[in-house]
Amino acid sequence: MMILHYLKSAVRSLMKYKIQTVASMVGLALGFVCFALSAVWVRYEQTFDSFHRGADRMYLLGSSSAWENQTNLKHRFPLAEELKETFPEVEDAAAYWYWEIPVKLSEDAAEDVNLGCVRSDSLFVRMFDVRLVRGSWSFLNVPEEVALTEEGARRLFGTTDVLGRTIYYAGNTYRISAVLTGWGQHTNFPFSIMFGMDQTEKNKSSYPDYYISLRLRSEADTAALMAQMNNSSLKYKVAKMWNGKKSVLSLEPLTHCRYTVFQDRLSVSIFYIRLFSALGLLLIVLALVNFFSMLVSRMHLRRRELALRIACGSSRVGLTGVFLSELLLILSGAVLSGMIFIEIVEKPFCTLSGIEGSIRLPVAVCFLLLAAVTFLMTWGIIVFYCHRIASRQLQPAVVVRPERFSFQKICLGVQFGICALVLFALSFLLLQVRHLAHTDIGFERDGRATIFCPDSESLKEHIIHELRRQPYVQEVKQLYSLFPQGSSGGLAVSSWDGKLDNADPITLNAIPEGQEFIDFYGLRLIAGNSLKAQGDTMAAVINETAARMMNMANPIGKKVGMWTIVGVVRDFHVSAPTVPVDPVILIEFNCPVQMGRDILVHFDESDTDRLKHFVDSLVQSEEPGVFLKITTVREAYEEYLRSERTLQKLLTVVAVVCVLITLIGVFAHVSLVCEQRRKEITIRKVNGATAAGIFHSFLKEYFALLLVACVIAFPLGSVAMQNWVERYVERMAWPWWLYAAILVGLALFVVLCIGRSVWRAARENPAEVIKSE
């Protein structure tokens, strides 16, 4: 019965302060939602491939690459068995080929389905515990047979009863002889189809094309094992890279590969996902500060009621029970509201994050943990203030004296500070992304497109001929694609004019093109002359980065290997904006570096869809089923900004939630303060104060809090964003005006929050207020 009494009292109290109750519930719910979603996302990204047996002891073998900051993951097939036989620390080893391949139901099928494919042997099956659902393992030894996972069978045929059926791939028909268990998509190698390998293919050691996974014994020392591998003379290890440097083997934990060696597969950088999680935690802090502020304000507003309860015999436990009942109701409402929000955002969130299945269970667990932590923290505050009120109940003068509570002011200042910090970060991000999207990247990106198509010269000639007849096409060339790069080649250079004796060889990104290529992309010559269309094959043009790497102040006329430098072009970006510009050399056609050429189109950017539709229709009418891809320079560059665009969306959501929580909190707080200070406002009016003067006094108080909060938040935000922007090669000028803009915006926000409540309180009839008091 006592519990029922507490609940009734709690409901009456919460109904009396409706605005504050709703503000507390909504604020906590929004904070819970943002933090829970970010926590689920981080956990999902950090648990890729964790379902394998002994996943904490599994590694992916890597080796150093000729290109800086890159790791080579492909090796010769026999190296896996050699490592297992040579090093007792290796418990299991498996080599496998993995790629996504287009599969058809028959040769005449109009459409193909892209499936993750693995080619390997029984060692892969044993190491990764691949289970046979139906059929036999004969496909591992019979080249004409293949196995599908249950998920792959459903995608192709709509059923798992597929034994004996056939599929078509790469000009061959394969019979399905097995159905296997799959791994789903929560893995770095989501395969749906598996081929076996005959002994002849396994013994081929000429070209490294296979991933190698190792499972080490529990007592193995990873660092010591890597040292032994690199000091041993392994027969199937690539001893030296093509630039002459020694190849160094490394072991990357399989569960870390998602955000290390395979980070380019991420739609959002793991750094940004963790940042989103940190922002979710910041929102929880904001919501809790908002909640605690209103809780303490309500307790002080009810101090007479509480003192009367104590005078009538109520104990501290009883007072605590009243407030804990209110707390339980508010937390229950927040959790229920949060689950409703989750229902609304679950689908778009899963699409953005790539999480499979429902997230309701982990989110619900996260909600309960957050609610429990909030309950325990609030319990402490309630006990403290109940003890304080009980200790003063025999001092009426103290109880009834109006007070200005510093706790609420601190809470408001924290809310303003967090809001200013998030708004500054979002605004800075938007400006930097806009700068990256519109900055000069060293070549023309407007109206340039690349058509990647098969090596059919007749088809290419036909496409070029038809494109030149289109009114929106200015120019069509068959050249190397600069951006996006279709293929790339490295040129190891160990000698050049002015080279120091202790200087290491350098690797240049070699482009076998001349003047036609330079003109098409609008590369800017800053020194010397350009390459002639049919000039000296020993002439070369380099970029600024190559000149700096070779320490050439005036490179014109100097030798690089067998080539003579005739010109220098301005640096141009053909990689992500976080990656420094590569050293580049442009050389004539008859050179050792051989690269494929694609169809380059200069056209009106507004007709992008029209161009794509025309080329697709043309190719399908000439050679149906031929794979063709059209990409504009702008689309390819936007792909590099994909993580930043996603972070922009996440930060926008966080900023909106942050402003909303602060708006609700400030409005609710001002409503309580106006209720608490009604008599003070009335006495001021009786003594001659005007409504405008009272409103001005409130504004001064809140503007002072806002100014102090911004003075603290802006330096913190500046340091954080300075560290973030240093990741980029191209950076915008520091926006000093942004501080004033955010401060003015938040000041208007404060006026909006407090205006109605303060103005209404200031215009009340003093006689009515005195009567009610």
Positions of predicted regions on the chain:
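Membrane-helix entry/capping segments
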Residues: 1-7, 12-16, 20, 52, ...
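Alpha-helical transmembrane segments of integral membrane proteins
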Residues: 1-25, 262-265, 295-306, 310-328, ...
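A generic "structured core" feature
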Residues: 13-15, 308, 319-320, 662-665, ...
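Hydrophobic alpha-helical transmembrane segments of multi-pass inner-membrane transport and secretion
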Residues: 16-43, 268-304, 332, 407-432, ...
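Membrane-proximal extracellular/periplasmic loop immediately following the first transmembrane helix
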Residues: 38-102, 201-202, 208-215, 219, ...
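Mid-to-C-terminal secondary-structure elements
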Residues: 121-134, 146-268, 465, 469-639
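Transmembrane alpha-helical interface segments in multi-pass membrane proteins
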Residues: 305-350, 679-726, 741, 745
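Hydrophobic alpha-helical transmembrane segments of polytopic membrane proteins
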Residues: 363-384, 420, 663, 710-712, ...
